[in-house]
Amino acid sequence: NAVANGKEFTSIFISSVLNSVPFAKDREHIVCICAALCRPFTKLYACASSTAETGYRQVNGKAFHNESNAGNIAFRLEYESGVRIGDFQDKPKVQKYHTKKEFYELFSPFFRNVQISEMTGNVNAKCENVRRIPWERLEEALRFEFNLPYPDGSRMGLIDEAISAFKHRYEILG
């Protein structure tokens, strides 16, 4: 209801979500949807693990690996830079570690002002002055994100509801 009714947000935060999304196009969908929630005055803040973080440096042989953390063994994946797979003892997961340049390139299509910083193994973005998102681009993101599969194979099935809410938002906010 908040989306459809045009609720205006002063700030939006994306914390550690983007390093759990293994494919670039999927990360773009998330940023697109978050940008669609912004008004010209809204600030979007994002944080994700950077390639300077120990978890990624280990797969490049740049961080000490000893027997006590052998359960944290991970491997680099070659389909995109900064991606590794690990946590084999529980449930394997893919993690994306970002460079400052990659983070800038992820947000700059959606915002006119993008400031990127790196601190303590994280890359951070502060985004302002949202760009107008073509409806077709937003609809593509909504169709993907609101029909993701659950582990049992069923799907979210919220495409129509999401499209309706964002379409109404576009109509009332322009």
Enumerate the language-model features and the residues they cover.
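A short SAM/SAH-binding and catalytic strip from SAM-dependent methyltransferases
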Residues: 9-26
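Short coil/turn segments at beta-strand junctions that form active-site/ligand-binding loops
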Residues: 7-10, 42
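Class I (Rossmann-like) S-adenosyl-L-methionine-dependent methyltransferase catalytic domain
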Residues: 1-4, 43-174
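Flexible, active-site-proximal loop/turn residues at the rims of small-molecule/cofactor binding pockets
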Residues: 18, 30, 50
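A short glycine-rich, Lys/Arg-flanked "PGG" loop and its adjoining helix->strand segment in the class I
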Residues: 26-43
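Short His-Asn-centered micro-motif
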Residues: 14-16, 38, 47-48
